[in-house]
Amino acid sequence: MYRAKHDGRNCFRFFTAEMQIHSSRRLQLENALRRALERDQLSLHYQPQISLQDGRIIGAEALLRWQHPELGMVSPAEFIPIAEDSGLILPIGEWVLRTATQQLKAWMDQDMEPMVMAVNLSAVQFRHAHLPDLVTQILEEAKLPPQYLELELTEGVAMDMTKLHC
């Protein structure tokens, strides 16, 4: 039903065993994702950004990862769309922003050279009315100047913006 709705008006789909498997997996992941934040199953991996001129680390990108105790490592390509569709992306995104800024501040407090922390935003987060206030609050909590936070928009955000303006 959701697939037919997604495809647009006057569409229909025949229910198949493959759809049942996909639907069951999606429901399983959504329920598990609801508990993942509480159970500390989400983590950030930091990918360094290197200057091509001199080889210095000039930044890091915070990459969200999910290690489920039974399912193992769940791909972001699989769980991010579920988080977006279910509304879980907002608390998860807040956790990512908060954790990444705290980590950067901790590195800077250890006398590491200042650098930029890049955090990806989904279309859902980008459209959320309270995003500017949330970012300001998190930066203030971490005592981190705003020039050290880089918000990256995914391709999905650009596609959504294109649809809005067409």
Language-model-detected regions and their locations in the chain:
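Bacterial c-di-GMP phosphodiesterase EAL domain
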Residues: A17-L144, G156-V157
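Conserved glycine-bearing catalytic or ligand-binding loops at nucleotide- and phosphate-handling centers
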Residues: M1-F15, Q20
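Flexible, glycine-biased helix-capping/connector loops in cytosolic signal-transduction modules
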Residues: D7-N10, D40-L42, Q147
